[in-house]
Amino acid sequence: MRLAFMGSPGFAVPALRALHAAGHDIVAVYCQPPRPVGRGHRIHKCPVHEAAEALGLTVRTPERLRRDDAERAYFRALDLDAAVVAAYGQILPADMLVAPRRGCINIHASLLPRWRGAAPIHAAILAGDAQTGVTIMQMDEGLDTGATLLAEAVPIGPEDTMVDLLDRLADLGAALVIKVLDGNFPPVPQPEGGVTYAPKLSKADAEIDWSASAAVILRRIRAFRPWPGTETRLDGEALKIIRAEPAAGQGEPGTVLDDRLAIACGDAAIRPTLVQRAGRAAMQAEAFLRGHPVAIGTRLG
């Protein structure tokens, strides 16, 4: 099948590789442009860009498709059977959605209509969902509102982080989109009920609100690993909490309760087990406390 592939982050790479391995003719790969990253502002290509070049595929990196008439004309002229989209990072204009003979097919990391939007994996963990999954969807002009072609659920374990689920869902999405392209799956409109949204996250979401329940804070730590992370303030400096576990005790939210760094939350307490100071490597909490003792009664945040 003659395809375009549109994706940017690591989540999309397994699908690109699976389509290529299955023998589909991928005539163009669209992804976000290279951007400066880190303190040195070195130009960095996104994971899909690097994977596509390794496969010898043509890469297109338009900055804004909606404003790029020439790029949209190029896309329409590709004579595509379908376009496969996976976390591309841009909204596709209407003329592109209908250009391929089978339209544009999206790999979405949730069981639609639950968690439409930019951060469905994070949202599922934050909500305490027992499961999530992947939906292969026929795209329309709405935000993840298109008809469902195929979906499969994945359980969320009590210790699963965003990265754990990301890897499993990426592999599942690759397998499901191959099935859809090779088979005949009639589109099923999404139900009107059960719609929830997963908005885009920002660095501001990293700050821990210690007045929240221990369960909510633990879910945030799992959901926001590695980005945007979860952090608090200790002695005026940022302290990232990368892993944590439930702990006994109660107190004023944000207060250190014992010499092993149990921290009071809105209803109970948590104990960080892996932390990171600004500019330092991550370390076990025990090692951190040996070099940086924290007195009982210290307030964080």
Curated annotation (Swiss-Prot):
The keyword NAD does not apply. It catalyses: L-methionyl-tRNA(fMet) + (6R)-10-formyltetrahydrofolate = N-formyl-L-methionyl-tRNA(fMet) + (6S)-5,6,7,8-tetrahydrofolate + H(+). PROSITE patterns: GART. One of its GO terms (cellular component) is cytosol. Its EC number is 2.1.2.9. Gene3D superfamilies: 3.40.50.12230. It holds the Pfam family Formyl_trans_C. InterPro entries: Fmt, Formyl_trans_C, Formyl_transf_N, Formyl_transf_N_sf, Formyl_transferase-like_C_sf, GART_AS, Met-tRNA-FMT_C, Met-tRNA-FMT_N. GO terms for molecular function: methionyl-tRNA formyltransferase activity. It is an enzyme of class 2 (transferase). Keywords: Protein biosynthesis, Transferase. (6S)-5,6,7,8-tetrahydrofolate binds at S110, L111, L112, P113. Belongs to the Fmt family. Attaches a formyl group to the free amino group of methionyl-tRNA(fMet). The formyl group appears to play a dual role in the initiator identity of N-formylmethionyl-tRNA by promoting its recognition by IF2 and preventing the misappropriation of this tRNA by the elongation apparatus. This is Methionyl-tRNA formyltransferase. It comes from Acidiphilium cryptum (strain JF-5). The lineage of its organism: Bacteria, Pseudomonadati, Pseudomonadota, Alphaproteobacteria, Acetobacterales. The gene is fmt.
